[in-house]
Amino acid sequence: MIEHFNGIIYLIIFVIHFLIYAVYAYRCIVTTKYFLDKYGVDHSAAIMTRFFGSMFLGSIIMAIYIIFIRPMIHGDIGLENPWAFFNLIFLQNLSAFIVAFYSIKISKLGINDKTSIDGVIVPGILTLLSAILCYGLADKM
């Protein structure tokens, strides 16, 4: 498995990236009330928050498929052909970062005392991690 990721570093980055996704999926889908209360959002936004979390969940399921299930079904083919998935993840992270930056620094719509800079920092970290994955795995995809 390690050789398919061009070494342990890229495998660790992959795992960290999707663990962060798992945390946010859990917080949005399972502990929705706590998540909404933390950011001062009305509980009527629960459905949209869970919708947001479901996007993370779908990506996690695909990542699990790529790393564990796909090799069992198709043999030891490594990371051949999942480039679209990794690029989509990068573009989603980049979009989240840009929109969050715009929302907090430029638009300021809905900014209050419970507004957290987490909305910019986490997508920024995820964008960096996914960019590193796209670069480091480019020859494998």
Segments predicted by a language model, with ranges:
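Hydrophobic transmembrane alpha-helical segments in integral membrane proteins
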Residues: 1-21
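Core segments of alpha-helical transmembrane spans in multipass integral membrane proteins
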Residues: 19-25, 46-71, 91-94
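Membrane-water interface of transmembrane alpha-helices
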Residues: 20-33, 97-104
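Cytosolic, membrane-interface loops and tails of multi-pass inner-membrane proteins
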Residues: 28-45
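Juxtamembrane helix-loop boundaries in multi-pass membrane proteins
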Residues: 41-56, 82-89, 112-126
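Hydrophobic alpha-helical membrane segments
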Residues: 85-104, 123-130
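Membrane-helix boundary connector in multi-pass membrane proteins
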Residues: 98-119, 139-140
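Juxtamembrane boundary at the C-terminal end of a transmembrane helix
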Residues: 130-141
